[in-house]
Design a protein with these regions (language model features):
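Long, low-complexity, intrinsically disordered segments
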Residues: 216-245
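Intrinsically disordered, low-complexity segments enriched in Ser/Pro/Gly/Ala and basic residues
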Residues: 76, 207-210, 241
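Short, small-residue-biased leader/transition segments that mark boundaries at the very start
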Residues: 3-8
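Short, solvent-exposed loop/turn segments at the edges of secondary structure
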Residues: 1-2, 71
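Aromatic-rich peripheral "rim/lid" segments of glycoside hydrolase catalytic domains that contact
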Residues: 134-212, 217-219
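Extracellular glycoside hydrolase catalytic/binding regions
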Residues: 10-153
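Extended hydrophobic/Leu-rich segments
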Residues: 10, 176, 180, 189, ...
Length: 245
């Protein structure tokens, strides 16, 4: 296994940008082709396709291509951990000012227009928040879930034990589960922002220069010089087999 890992690292080191998209598109196509060629239910089972770094901005880039497959049997998977300082690092304790809400709305709308409106289902397979302010965490999760519900996107709350006690089988924050139930009820309402959020949160929001997934610089917007066509990386079968074992 170690030799195989070294092979992957050496073969694709430094391959971001256009080449990074070509590699991922090629892997995703090879995955679909491999499953479909194995008979039985594999011919039509639904397959989940990982976006670029699970990042919404990078995945909505036109260089990312969904694999060719039978109609309506591939589902896109991305994550939502924006901003990283609130969702992953526990540096920002409060969330919910106007600019932060607008950025969340922008990202979900981006998924809607790029994929949902073109017949491609989307799942946010991970989301969550680490900020210490309980009301902000609940508001973040409720607003994201409600936006996704209204735009036909399914969501999975990622829990590492901080939300649900697997010994007592109880929620640490009961209001969170109540908020998620409200958000998925199908009722028309606007999640209520906690008081004083505008004063307690920073005004900065992610921009097109900020990666949603890890706060590293995002890929530049495609230009005529590097916009790809429908072609993807050609990965020989023997290479794919060596990577997958």
């Amino acid at each position: 296994r170690r030799q195989r890992q070294m092979c992957i690292r050496d073969r694709f080191v430094g391959s971001g940008g256009d080449r990074g998209y070509e590699i991922l598109n090629g892997f995703n196509q090879a995955f679909v082709d491999t499953v479909r060629s194995n008979g039985g239910n594999n011919g039509y089972r639904h397959l989940v396709i990982a976006g670029y770094a699970a990042d919404i901005t990078k995945t909505c880039d036109p260089r990312f291509k969904m694999p060719e497959d039978i109609d309506n049997h591939c589902i896109l998977s991305v994550h939502y951990y924006t901003p990283k300082t609130f969702c992953r690092a526990s540096i920002q304790n409060y969330w919910g000012n106007k600019s932060e809400q607008e950025w969340m709305e922008h990202q979900i709308n981006n998924l809607r227009t790029t994929f949902i409106d073109n017949g491609i289902p989307v799942i946010i397979t991970e989301y969550g928040a680490k900020g210490s302010d309980e009301a902000s965490r609940v508001f973040f999760c409720e607003m994201l879930t409600k936006l996704c519900r209204d735009n036909y996107i399914s969501t999975f709350l990622w829990d590492d034990g901080s939300e649900f006690d697997r010994t007592s089988f109880t929620w640490h924050t009961p209001e969170l589960i109540n908020a998620l139930k409200r958000a998925t009820s199908g009722n028309s309402y606007v999640p209520e922002k906690p008081e004083n959020i505008d004063e307690q949160t920073r005004e900065a929001k992610p921009t097109s220069e900020t990666s949603e997934h890890d706060n590293e610089p995002a890929e530049p917007e495609p230009t005529e010089e590097h916009t790809t066509t429908e072609e993807t990386a050609d990965i020989p079968p023997e290479t794919f087999q060596s990577l997958t074992g």
